[in-house]
Structures are given as structure tokens and as C-alpha cells.
Amino acid sequence: MTFPVAIQVYSVRDAASKNMYGTFKKLKEMGYDGVEFAGLYGHTPEEVREMCEDIGLTPISAHVPYIDMVRDPEGVLRQYAEIGCKYVAVPYLTEEYRPGTPRFPEVIGNVKMIGAVAKKLGMTLLYHNHDFEFLKIDGKYALDILYESVPADLLQTELDLCWVNVGGENPSEYLLKYTGRAPVVHYKDFVGGKSENMYELIGIEKKASAPSEAFEFRPVGYGKQDFPTILKATEKAGCTWVIVEQDQPSMGLSPMECAAKSRAYLKSIGC
């Protein structure tokens, strides 16, 4: 089955921050159907909406910092409603809010609140996982506890299949677990094993030590993920959008070249 394919703009953030319109135009030429935002790079919602309309890209979703949505949910989310986003996502939890800390129950309550505000504005809240949500609490993954605790009409999944794999689960099987609750899925490829310094690789936490293993993000189709099987699971799970994400470029390629390789590979397997 052919799915519309978007790209998480964080993957090409340097180019987008310098020239969003030109970058979006090149992404459209590569065959991308939509974009998922990670900031607006100084543009107004109206300007971004007009860019997408002019180029023919669907502004499908946005990653919005958790704490920003907690502090001013309606004000922050309204910007993305004005752009035309169907979804907004909690992209990442800093250490003090993660599973296993005293503040994780607070996160669950806030996610319910944010989901209600998003629904009021005509959008659906998603949660984008990393590997740390695969911590078990009383025998259950924290990620599963989150989805059990928040009603489906207030929260849907945005499973990042790289991090599902790193977290110790089979990406296809875990995606199928959320059949009917997985409108958007992140396709991300990688090689190597889990590093003690994973989050330096996604540009969020900087530490002095180098990664202890040769973990590297790759263009989709150029790593260890089984995407033909994942694509079948994507269809069975009822997903409606595939989103490509590559946190850091690799293989000696630029971020835009990596984006092009990912899209070309997905076309080659019928997506």
C-alpha cells in the first residue's frame, strides 16, 4: 500500500532554518507529501501555511516542546491549528519528567489536559517515544501505562520505530499492538547497538564522552530495520501517514541527501 510520506523537518533543520521555502520546495521535488514541524524558524503561522499551500505540502503535524504546551496549551497549540496541522506531538521528555521519576504521573495528567485542548482546536495529540519509555513499572512498559491512562480520543500514538527497536521490542509487532490508535508512524533507520550517550546523537543532551558503541542513524532502508515487514504492519495497524526522521546525517551525505535517499527507498518498496 502506498502511504503519504512526510518528513520531520528536524531532519533538515539547518537548511530549513536558512531557507524554509527553498527547503520545502526541494522536499516536494524529492516526493515528500507533507512536513512535520519542529519549530517555525521565525516565520508566522500564516507564512508557513502559505508556503505549504504554494508548494503543495501537507502540514500534517508538529513536535511541540512538552513544557511549552503545559505552560500555555491554547496559545501554543493555536499556532499549529492556524497552519492547518491535523496532529501535534509531545516529542521528548527531559530527564526530570521521565518514567521512573516522581514527576512521571504529573506528565500523564498534563498529557490528558493537552489532549483536551488539542481536541478543542480540531487537532489530535500524539506521543512520540524514545527508548526510555520502555522502562517497566510494575511489570508494564511506561509507554503502555501512558496509553492506558489517557483516553484514545485525547491521545494517539506516534511510534518511533527506531526507538522501539532500541527499547528491545520488535517494531512491526509493537506497531500492531496499537492497531487503530496509530495514525502516524515514524520511520527511522540505524546501525549499531545502544550507546550510553544516545541523546548526544539526537542533538539534545551534550556530554563529554564519546558513544561507547557504533550507533549511527541512517537513511531509511540503509540500516538494520526490516522496512518491507514494517510497511505491511503499517497497513494492518491502520496508519494514515508515514513520517521519515533522521536525527543526524550519515554515510558522508548531507541531511538533504539523506532525505532524498530515504524517500527513494520508500518508493522502491511501494510506499
Locate predicted features.
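Active-site acidic/histidine proton-transfer and metal-coordination neighborhood
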Residues: K25, G34, Y66-T157, K177, ...
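N-terminal pre-domain/capping segments
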Residues: M1-Y87, Q156, K232, A260-C271
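Acidic-and-aromatic substrate-binding clefts and catalytic sites of carbohydrate-active enzymes
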Residues: V12-K18, G34-E47, V64-D72, E95-P99, ...
